[in-house]
């Protein structure tokens, strides 16, 4: 079973059909990159998956649990998350402190090693202030 499964997803901005029948599966532990030029629908796809943008049709399941049509908070509870593009960080906190802000309910206040394994540049810059990053 796929950790994330998307079948025939359709999203619109008003009457403009912007995501057409998108279908894909992501296995547990798999890393996926969504790439494309500006305006190709990368952010729109992610906003559709997390529920920020409503979809008109299609199925989204997380670990076998249907989440299409559910509110954003229910999708987060199912294990989904979304980090928007741009500088949506605290500029006066370090990179490490910015990462830790998302770990408020965790008793061990250290950045998990898997984050640095997947994104080694974060480890190299963990002491830099977020506002100083380019």
Region annotations inferred by a language model:
Residues 35-37:
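The feature captures the beta-strand-to-loop junction immediately N-terminal to the Walker
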Residues 59-61, 65-66:
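ATP-binding/catalytic-site motifs of ATP-hydrolyzing domains
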Residues 16-17, 74:
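Short coil-to-beta microelement around the adenine-binding A-loop and adjacent beta1/P-loop entry
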Residues 32-33, 82:
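Short beta-strand immediately N-terminal to the Walker A/P-loop
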Residues 66-87, 112, 126-130:
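ABC ATPase NBD coupling module
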Residues 50:
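Helix-to-loop junction immediately C-terminal to a conserved catalytic motif
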Residues 92-100, 126:
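Short coil-to-helix segment of the ABC ATPase nucleotide-binding domain corresponding to the Q-loop/switch region
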């Amino acid at each position: 079973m796929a950790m994330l499964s998307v079948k025939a997803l359709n999203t619109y901005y008003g009457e403009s059909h912007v995501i057409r029948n998108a279908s894909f599966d992501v296995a547990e532990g798999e890393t996926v990159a969504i790439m494309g030029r500006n305006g190709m629908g990368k952010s729109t796809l992610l906003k559709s998956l997390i529920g920020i943008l409503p979809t008109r049709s299609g199925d989204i399941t997380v670990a076998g649990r249907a989440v299409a049509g559910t509110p954003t908070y229910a999708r987060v509870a199912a294990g989904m998350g979304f980090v928007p593009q741009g500088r949506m960080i605290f500029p006066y906190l370090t990179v490490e402190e910015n990462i830790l802000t998302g770990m408020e309910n965790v008793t061990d206040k250290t950045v998990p090693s898997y984050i640095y394994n997947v994104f080694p540049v974060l480890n190299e810059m963990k002491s830099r202030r977020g506002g100083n990053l380019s």
